[in-house]
Amino acid sequence: MKVAVLGAAGGIGQALALLLKTQLPAGSDLSLYDIAPVTPGVAVDLSHIPTDVTIAGFAGMDPTDALVGADVVLISAGVARKPGMDRSDLFNINAGIIKNLAGKCAEVCPNACIGIITNPVNTTVPIAAEVLKQAGVYDKRKLFGITTLDVIRSETFVSALKGISLADVEVPVIGGHSGVTILPLLSQVKGVEFTAEEVVALTARIQNAGTEVVEAKAGGGSATLSMGQAAARFGLSLVRALQGEKGIVECTYVDGGSEHATFFAQPVLLGKNGVEEVLAYGELSEFETNARDAMLEELKANITLGEEFVAG
């Protein structure tokens, strides 16, 4: 099993690479790519960690060497948020990066599963889809927007608020991966009751948690370490499913035939070909139904923006 991380020299990429080096199954290959010249050095640094994961690093303008033979590609390349920016402000730079890297994946590893971390995910995933379609290699089962950060934040915040073990907390998160398009289904958390006020406050905190980190870092970065952990959780789940492990479910932003939008985040059963089945997300509370319906205009606009970017 070969996993490639594109954007591996950045804050998310290095955290992700560390977690993959220590947690990928024995015998895996881990390939790191970034335009930054430090990237081969990041690989050397990680190579000193005693795990049975082979690692190589590549720098420069062409990621081809990193992508050859890749089964999974995780893309975190791009610029990060700074104070005063929202995820859509990143679009102008990151859209072009994703377009180029998706094109390289289509050319070098057309059968790989691709997980996109680069924001704005609501838009960068449709960009990748359009590029793969143009190349004639699009398989909607193999393209994912990684929204796991919303899930782990939800789990953490619910556990802290209610004083319950994280082992007992599961929070499905549906919709998209920015602002009001992030919808944690708090009504589905087992064994916990929330007041109406708690639901409103907790939903808002989860939706704005990225801004919380950006402001706390005072211009020094965005959520890199928690995002690295979230991407590792998703990537490792995907690897296990590709290797035949059954019953692995993660929430992720996919082209899954949703009645709401072309791309929509919801629970997905992973399998040997990527998405095995897009799962129903169950009954919503009145608050959640209203929030879902209210987000759709923005989510659809984000998707259209990506499609039009590739169409030119």
From Swiss-Prot:
<dbReference type="GO" id="GO:0030060">
    <property type="term" value="F:L-malate dehydrogenase (NAD+) activity"/>
</dbReference>
<dbReference type="InterPro" id="IPR036291">
    <property type="entry name" value="NAD(P)-bd_dom_sf"/>
</dbReference>
<feature type="binding site">
    <location>
        <position position="227"/>
    </location>
    <ligand>
        <name>NAD(+)</name>
    </ligand>
</feature>
<comment type="subunit">
    <text>Homodimer.</text>
</comment>
<dbReference type="InterPro" id="IPR001236">
    <property type="entry name" value="Lactate/malate_DH_N"/>
</dbReference>
<dbReference type="GO" id="GO:0006108">
    <property type="term" value="P:malate metabolic process"/>
</dbReference>
<dbReference type="Pfam" id="PF00056">
    <property type="entry name" value="Ldh_1_N"/>
</dbReference>
<dbReference type="GO" id="GO:0006099">
    <property type="term" value="P:tricarboxylic acid cycle"/>
</dbReference>
<feature type="binding site">
    <location>
        <begin position="117"/>
        <end position="119"/>
    </location>
    <ligand>
        <name>NAD(+)</name>
    </ligand>
</feature>
<keyword id="KW-0520">NAD</keyword>
<feature type="binding site">
    <location>
        <position position="119"/>
    </location>
    <ligand>
        <name>substrate</name>
    </ligand>
</feature>
<feature type="binding site">
    <location>
        <begin position="7"/>
        <end position="13"/>
    </location>
    <ligand>
        <name>NAD(+)</name>
    </ligand>
</feature>
<dbReference type="GO" id="GO:0005737">
    <property type="term" value="C:cytoplasm"/>
</dbReference>
<dbReference type="InterPro" id="IPR023958">
    <property type="entry name" value="Malate_DH_type1_bac"/>
</dbReference>
<feature type="binding site">
    <location>
        <position position="153"/>
    </location>
    <ligand>
        <name>substrate</name>
    </ligand>
</feature>
<dbReference type="Pfam" id="PF02866">
    <property type="entry name" value="Ldh_1_C"/>
</dbReference>
<feature type="binding site">
    <location>
        <position position="81"/>
    </location>
    <ligand>
        <name>substrate</name>
    </ligand>
</feature>
<feature type="active site" description="Proton acceptor">
    <location>
        <position position="177"/>
    </location>
</feature>
<feature type="binding site">
    <location>
        <position position="34"/>
    </location>
    <ligand>
        <name>NAD(+)</name>
    </ligand>
</feature>
<dbReference type="InterPro" id="IPR001557">
    <property type="entry name" value="L-lactate/malate_DH"/>
</dbReference>
<dbReference type="InterPro" id="IPR010097">
    <property type="entry name" value="Malate_DH_type1"/>
</dbReference>
<comment type="similarity">
    <text>Belongs to the LDH/MDH superfamily. MDH type 1 family.</text>
</comment>
<feature type="binding site">
    <location>
        <position position="87"/>
    </location>
    <ligand>
        <name>substrate</name>
    </ligand>
</feature>
<protein>
    <recommendedName>
        <fullName>Malate dehydrogenase</fullName>
        <ecNumber>1.1.1.37</ecNumber>
    </recommendedName>
</protein>
<keyword id="KW-0560">Oxidoreductase</keyword>
<dbReference type="InterPro" id="IPR015955">
    <property type="entry name" value="Lactate_DH/Glyco_Ohase_4_C"/>
</dbReference>
<dbReference type="InterPro" id="IPR022383">
    <property type="entry name" value="Lactate/malate_DH_C"/>
</dbReference>
<comment type="function">
    <text>Catalyzes the reversible oxidation of malate to oxaloacetate.</text>
</comment>
<keyword id="KW-0816">Tricarboxylic acid cycle</keyword>
<feature type="binding site">
    <location>
        <position position="94"/>
    </location>
    <ligand>
        <name>NAD(+)</name>
    </ligand>
</feature>
<dbReference type="InterPro" id="IPR001252">
    <property type="entry name" value="Malate_DH_AS"/>
</dbReference>
